[in-house]
């Protein structure tokens, strides 16, 4: 395996404050040679300068946009610069553990998979709690309608317990926190669907791969950890609020439903979930409100005052 055989594309998931920690971890924990393409969409000055310095020092290709980019748009920009047999997409808030890349590549080589996902962990301390080990994602036709069936496998388990139970296997679902794809696959499928601004992009790709006859595998020998918010730095907030804005969420929902001809208005509750997820930006304020009003009073205030104001303000600022 030589460097040009693997391109790693890093993009911002929802914030920038983890960029330095994640990039340093990537280099420290990755032994296999790779080409790095880093797509920086509108990061704050401190992060921008750090990435410019690191790009010169380490020799990776930095694509800089002055404006914020939707993650799918950023991945497509990175994909235009990818070379070699495999491309790995990874978010800028993900930590990796030694051997992760070798395990993903080995799985692709031995199975012929079009997509390979690692065992995904989340939260801090890192590599203790499981986010998912693959899952299901398919369209079910029933009662004259088309419905999305989606579920994570083994979410919330302790890593040491889950890892002892799982092994490499075919799956229907991997996520863009980190995944390996065959570069040649995009010659057949085309680029990632840029109409999916904030949600459904991982499901869309998995559905498209399986519809085209490709296979998807989960490789638990590869470990990554998504560092979830909160906290969010003040400099993270503008992008975070756009990334999960009602405008982007609704556009993604409409596009995904239309593309896959779905009957349900909110497939698997995704719109409801991402709308609530955006409110993580309010967590410091919510904590103070609950300290002042108690759990019951604070919850009432959130539902009847804070959340409606946040939603109206988000729609006003990001039409």
Predicted regions and their residues:
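Glycine-rich, basic loop-to-helix element that forms the pyrophosphate-binding segment
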Residues: 65-82
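A recurrent flexible, glycine/aromatic-enriched loop bordering the glycosyltransferase active site
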Residues: 72-73, 144-181
